[in-house]
UniProtKB/Swiss-Prot annotation:
Transcription regulation as UniProt keyword: no
Known catalytic reactions: Exonucleolytic cleavage in either 5'- to 3'- or 3'- to 5'-direction to yield nucleoside 5'-phosphates
Name of the top EC class for this enzyme: hydrolase
A Pfam family matched in the record: Exonuc_VII_S
Name the record gives this protein: Exodeoxyribonuclease 7 small subunit
Region Disordered, annotated ranges: 1-22
This enzyme's EC code(s): 3.1.11.6
One Gene Ontology biological process: DNA catabolic process
SUPFAM superfamilies assigned: XseB-like (SSF116842)
Entry function: Bidirectionally degrades single-stranded DNA into large acid-insoluble oligonucleotides, which are then degraded further into small acid-soluble oligonucleotides.
GO MF term set: exodeoxyribonuclease VII activity
CC terms in the record's Gene Ontology section: cytosol; exodeoxyribonuclease VII complex
């Protein structure tokens, strides 16, 4: 089923909207929701619906980022190491940059 809602339409309240196809689409929808909510023109009920949708989109984006991070780790052969706070302070080589 194709999505036919226009960007200015009231968010549907059924909570069954499909997830976007990718991270970029989710982020764009999230930015639109935030702008509409900040605009102050939504009713309380519509704001709550938009908030719920936004929370779903945030979770989707986090999952997508975690998947990509895992793929990067695999491609790097698990050579990624966290930067310890002591390493940056004792290095001293790039302090003048």
């Amino acid at each position: 089923m194709a999505k036919t809602a226009s960007p200015g339409a009231t968010p549907p309240g059924n909570g069954t909207e499909p997830l976007p196809d990718n991270y970029e689409m989710a982020l764009a929808e999230l930015e639109t929701l935030v702008a509409r909510m900040e605009g102050g023109a939504l009713s309380l009920e519509d704001s709550l619906t938009a908030y719920r949708r936004g929370a779903t989109l945030v979770a989707f984006c986090q999952q997508q980022l975690e998947k990509v991070e895992q793929q990067v780790r695999v491609l790097d052969g698990a050579t990624l190491k966290p930067l310890s706070s002591g390493t940056a302070a004792t290095d001293g080589e790039d302090d003048d940059l």
